[in-house]
A protein has these predicted regions:
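Generic structural signal for beta-strand residues in well-ordered domains
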Residues: 40-41, 70, 176, 197, ...
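Long, positively charged, glycine-interspersed low-complexity recognition regions
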Residues: 230-255
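Short low-complexity, flexible loop/linker segments enriched in glycine and/or proline
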Residues: 41-42, 121-123, 220-222, 248-252
Length: 255
C-alpha cells in the first residue's frame, strides 16, 4: 500500500504515480489526520510512505499518526520524501520510526520537487515548476524500479550538516517558526471556506465569513497556496510571491 501526506500536491502526485506503477492501493493520510482516524490500516506486506520534508524530517503530524496507528500485515517500509532542496538526515529518523513499528526499513529516497514553503522561501512560476517536475522523472523512475524489484533504496547523503539540521534544528524550527500567528485574510477573501476544507489539522475556521487560524499548525501551506483569490498572506513574507500547488500545473497541460 502507498500512504501519502501532502501539503500542496507534490506528494500526492508522486504517490499516485508510484501506486499506479506498482498497482498498489493509495491511502490518503490527510483525510485520516483531519478526521482523527487512527483505526488499524490493512496495508499488506509492503508499505511505501510518501511525504514532503518539514524541517529536514517527515512531517511531525505523520510520525505522530504512525505512532498511534497499526499497519496490519506490514513487514517492510520504504520512505519517499520530496523536497525543495534537501532532506538532511531524515533517513536516520525514518529508520528509527520503522524500528518502532517493527518493520524492516527499506531506505529513504529523495525527490526534488517545486518549493511551496512561501512562509520562508520563494515558490517557482508555473513554467519553472513544470521543468522541476520533469527533471524529477528519472529519479521517480529509479525509485519505481527499485520498488518493483523489492530492493532497498541507496543510502542518502549523511554528514554533520545533515545530522545538525534534522537533529538540533528540527525541534527549534517547530518551536519558533511553525506557527499560524502570521496568517491573515485580505479584503480579497470571498469566504469560500477552501482553507477550512483543506487544513489537515482543522486549524482554520470561518468567523464572520473570514478565515481565522488557531494554534495547531504544521505549515503545510495548503491554505495560502490553494486560496482561489490569493487572499491569504503570511505576514509580509508571502507578499508578491507566486502561490504553488501541483494541480495548477495539470490544468493547462499533462505532466
Amino acid at each position: 500500500m502507498v500512504l501519502y501526506f501532502t501539503g500542496t500536491g507534490n506528494s500526492r502526485y508522486l504517490a499516485r504515480r508510484i501506486a499506479e506503477g506498482l498497482e498498489m492501493p493509495l491511502y490518503d493520510l490527510n483525510a485520516c489526520i483531519k478526521a482523527g482516524d487512527t483505526a488499524p490500516v490493512q496495508t499488506g506486506r509492503d508499505v511505501v510512505l510518501v511525504t514532503p520534508t518539514y524541517a529536514w524530517r517527515i512531517p511531525r503530524v505523520v510520525s505522530e499518526w504512525l505512532g498511534k496507528t497499526a499497519l496490519t500485515g506490514a513487514e517492510r517500509i520504504w520512505f519517499v520524501m520530496d523536497c525543495g532542496s534537501e532532506i538532511g538526515n531524515a533517513a536516520g529518523y525514518n529508520r528509527q520510526l520503522a524500528a518502532q513499528k517493527h518493520l524492516r526499513y527499506m531506505g529513504t529516497a529523495q525527490i526534488i520537487m517545486p518549493e511551496n514553503y512561501i512562509a520562508m522561501f520563494n515558490a517557482p512560476q508555473k513554467e519553472q515548476a513544470r521543468s522541476i517536475v520533469k527533471q524529477a522523472e528519472p529519479t521517480l523512475q529509479k525509485v519505481l524500479a527499485q520498488l518493483r524489484a523489492g530492493q532497498e533504496f541507496s543510502p542518502p547523503r549523511d554528514n554533520l550538516y545533515d545530522r545538525f539540521m534534522s537533529g538540533s534544528v528540527n525541534p527549534v524550527f517547530y518551536r519558533f517558526f511553525v506557527k499560524a500567528d502570521a496568517f491573515r485574510a485580505t479584503d480579497a477573501c470571498i469566504g469560500c471556506g477552501r482553507c477550512v476544507e483543506l487544513c489537515p489539522l482543522n486549524n482554520v475556521h470561518l468567523k464572520n465569513g473570514k478565515p481565522v487560524w488557531g494554534k495547531n499548525c504544521t505549515h503545510c501551506m495548503a491554505c495560502i497556496c490553494y486560496c482561489p483569490k490569493e487572499a491569504i498572506e503570511y505576514g509580509e513574507k508571502s507578499k508578491g510571491k507566486p502561490r504553488y500547488h501541483f494541480e495548477a500545473l495539470e490544468k493547462q497541460q499533462d505532466i
